[in-house]
Amino acid sequence: NSISICALKEGINAWDRDVDRFLNSEYVPLYNPVEEYLYDVGRWDGKDRIRALAGLVLCTNPYWRELFYRWFLSMVAHWRGVDRQHGNSTSPLLVGPQGYRKSTFCRIILPPELRFGYTDSIDFKSKQEAERYLGRFFLINIDEFDQINVSQQGFLKHLLQKPVANLRKPHGNTIREMRRYASFIGTSNQKDLLADPSGSRRFILSLIHISEPT
């Protein structure tokens, strides 16, 4: 609307349908901010920054650094579209008392250039909107994981394994696929989290002593 209004103010007869046709034409190249960021980063210099990032979380899980490393690689693989047949079906869970900066750690996982793709406000009550988040965000933090009820945990397990998001337009009957970019991480102050023990293999539990992101 704003584009067509500005055009009309300049004396250009451009209506909403004209703007829509232009934006969806070959004259406007596709822009993917995460692909551009990864391209600009350049070749790896050999320094292990992922395990160093994981090391900021002091926890009781002896496998934490390696599991976080694999999860992180899978997250980036989603961004690049390396494997479109499988979802990043695991999620780290940071468990510890309030004030241990669990959410702060989750935010700094993404570089500043990509933090617009971070959210901690997903609502599992709206299944269509929650599924839309798979293609809208790069990292979804399930803050206060212990507040999710049994049925919502079942739906979360479903989301974790989905390679794409299946969406229906408002008032429409056609379902279209949207590429998935999002991976999940969670935080909680409580240790008693998982209502369905069969789904526990999808979560990397990390009981935190203290987290020290800088």
Language-model-detected regions and their locations in the chain:
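C-terminal regulatory/interaction module of P-loop NTP-utilizing enzymes
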Residues: 117-128, 191-200, 211
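Residue-level detector of conserved catalytic or cofactor/ligand-binding positions
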Residues: 206-214
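Conserved AAA+/SF3 P-loop NTPase catalytic/coupling segment centered on the Walker-B
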Residues: 139-160, 194-199
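Conserved catalytic/switch belt of AAA+ P-loop NTPases
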Residues: 154-176
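Long, basic/Gly/Ser/Thr-rich N-terminal segments
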Residues: 1-33
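Canonical AAA+ ATPase core
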Residues: 180-197, 202-207
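P-loop NTPase catalytic core of nucleic-acid-dependent motor ATPases
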Residues: 25-135
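AAA+/SF3 P-loop NTPase mechanochemical coupling elements
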Residues: 130-135, 169-187
